[in-house]
């Protein structure tokens, strides 16, 4: 695998990590990603909510959690309360419903700030990947493995990848911030 291919793979991973982190940030709409990572105590051991129940959003401001085993509904309700997400689960016999309260302006600003911070972390990560790739290319040149013109071409390709993925991180975060600010 070439240096450029390795770099591209690492940058794609950084972007996927950003998408995953942003999925967990609260918006004004119900989103299963808000609670799927919550740890629930079932059968004597902690498990992620998405591993013990199906999570759906039947309405814009409501989540419906249907446990694979209906006896776990109470444990799921307790686990969501313990997670301190500011959500109040309503437990019935076979499911858990969560009404998503409307976000205040203060919460919107806080969520947008978190979104921006995640984007910046990703861009720093992408630039670190670029630095490591350039160092590897320079090392190969100093060892005589590649020529000067190949080094320059590699550096140019690596910079193009960096620009592309930083722009993609900006676009992803901008879309999420717009989603957060939509009332």
Curated annotation (Swiss-Prot):
One Gene Ontology term, aspect cellular component: cytoplasm
Superkingdom of origin: Bacteria
GO function term, MF aspect, one: ribosomal large subunit binding
KW Protein biosynthesis (keyword) present: yes
Sorted UniProt keywords: Cytoplasm, Protein biosynthesis
One biological process term in Gene Ontology: translational termination
Localisation: Cytoplasm
Family statement drawn from the similarity comment of this UniProt entry: Belongs to the RRF family.
Biological role stated in the UniProt entry: Responsible for the release of ribosomes from messenger RNA at the termination of protein biosynthesis. May increase the efficiency of translation by recycling ribosomes from one round of translation to another.
Protein name: Ribosome-recycling factor
Organism per entry: Protochlamydia amoebophila (strain UWE25)
């Amino acid at each position: 695998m070439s240096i450029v291919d390795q770099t591209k793979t690492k940058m794609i991973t950084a972007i996927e990590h950003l998408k995953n982190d942003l999925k967990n940030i609260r918006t004004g709409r119900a989103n299963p990603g808000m609670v799927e990572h919550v740890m629930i105590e079932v059968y004597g051991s902690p498990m992620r909510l998405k591993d013990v129940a199906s999570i759906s959003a039947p309405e814009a401001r409501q989540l419906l959690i249907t446990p694979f085993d209906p006896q776990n509904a109470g444990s799921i309700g307790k686990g969501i309360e313990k997670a301190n997400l500011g959500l109040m689960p309503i437990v019935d016999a076979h499911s858990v419903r969560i009404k998503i309260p409307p976000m205040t302006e203060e919460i919107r600003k806080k969520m947008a700030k978190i979104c921006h911070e995640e984007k910046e972390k990703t861009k720093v990560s992408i630039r670190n990947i670029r630095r490591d790739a350039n160092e590897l290319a320079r090392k190969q040149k100093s060892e005589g493995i590649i020529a000067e013109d190949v080094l320059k071409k590699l550096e140019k390709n690596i910079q193009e990848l960096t620009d592309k993925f930083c722009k993609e991180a900006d676009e992803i975060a901008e879309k999420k911030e717009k989603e957060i600010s939509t009332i």
